[in-house]
């Protein structure tokens, strides 16, 4: 075993994958099915709970500064991605909703104090909450006492020091709302067909570069993607987010490529490309 867990309560699903040199020190740790913890990850807080399909990549650090108190709790929803070298500081609670993407080198802070507060300098302590479907891209910083609503897209290198409403596009230093009520805005069938056909065309080109020589056909019809390999068919249901039919390394490669392009279909298997 190349990782170390110190906890009074441990609830880790058998499917979870944990990388090398991982250090976890919590009173309570819970990891749901198909979570992946990359190499050189540190998690130190009171309680850490992640739903299924967490992707926490190399060098992520959960901790720093007063993370042993009763409020030092981290709760993460389903299908969240947290990428390289991100820092999450849970001096106070941090809650991250379903399907959030947190880019590389992001920092989330729940405390900020250094100089003598008796001299009137700024200081701040408070929880951070991200709603569902939030995209917090690379090198952004979230400061204490911030709540970000559902379906929010934020620009790279932003400093978020105030609450952001549902459905907005926001960016800047400090972060400002550019447009409200922008998301979600579901594509009609015509636009979805155009998007999916473009994605599938790119995937076919990638298959050629990977040396996949099987006879492959892929097309879109009525909010479904059809994949034929010789006489074997796989159907990807975009509304229900499920798969029916034949599955093998090629069908899984397409599922993983769809994930990379923003169409996530979860099954009882990890995403895997050829």
Task: Give residue spans per PLM region.
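Residues that flank catalytic or metal-binding motifs in active/ligand-binding sites
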Residues: 104, 156, 166
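Terminal amphipathic alpha-helical/low-complexity segments used for targeting or macromolecular assembly
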Residues: 1-2, 7-8, 15, 173-274
């Amino acid at each position: 075993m190349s990782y170390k867990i110190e906890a009074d309560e441990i609830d880790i699903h058998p499917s979870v994958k944990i990388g090398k040199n991982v250090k976890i020190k919590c009173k309570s740790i819970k990891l749901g099915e198909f979570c992946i913890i990359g190499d050189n990850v540190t998690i130190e807080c009171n309680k850490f709970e992640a739903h299924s399909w967490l992707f926490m990549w190399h060098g992520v650090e959960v901790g720093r500064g007063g993370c042993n108190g009763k409020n030092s709790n981290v709760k993460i929803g389903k299908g969240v991605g947290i990428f390289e070298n991100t820092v999450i500081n849970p001096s106070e609670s941090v809650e991250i909703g379903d399907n959030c993407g947190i880019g590389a080198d992001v920092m989330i802070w729940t405390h900020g104090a250094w100089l003598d507060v008796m001299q009137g300098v700024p200081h701040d302590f408070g929880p951070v909450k991200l709603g569902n479907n939030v995209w917090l891209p690379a090198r952004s910083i979230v400061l204490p006492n911030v709540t970000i609503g559902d379906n929010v897209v934020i620009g790279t290198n932003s400093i978020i020091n105030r609450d952001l409403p549902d459905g907005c596009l926001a960016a800047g230093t400090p972060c400002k709302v550019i447009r409200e009520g922008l998301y979600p805005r579901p594509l009609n069938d015509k636009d979805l067909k155009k998007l999916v056909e473009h994605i599938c065309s790119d995937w076919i080109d990638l298959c050629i570069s990977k040396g996949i020589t099987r006879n492959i056909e892929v097309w879109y019809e009525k909010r479904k993607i059809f994949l034929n390999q010789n006489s074997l068919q796989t159907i990807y249901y975009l509304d229900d987010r499920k798969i029916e039919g034949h599955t093998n390394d090629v069908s899984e490669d397409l599922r993983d490529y769809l994930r990379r392009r923003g169409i996530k279909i979860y099954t009882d298997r990890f995403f895997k490309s050829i």
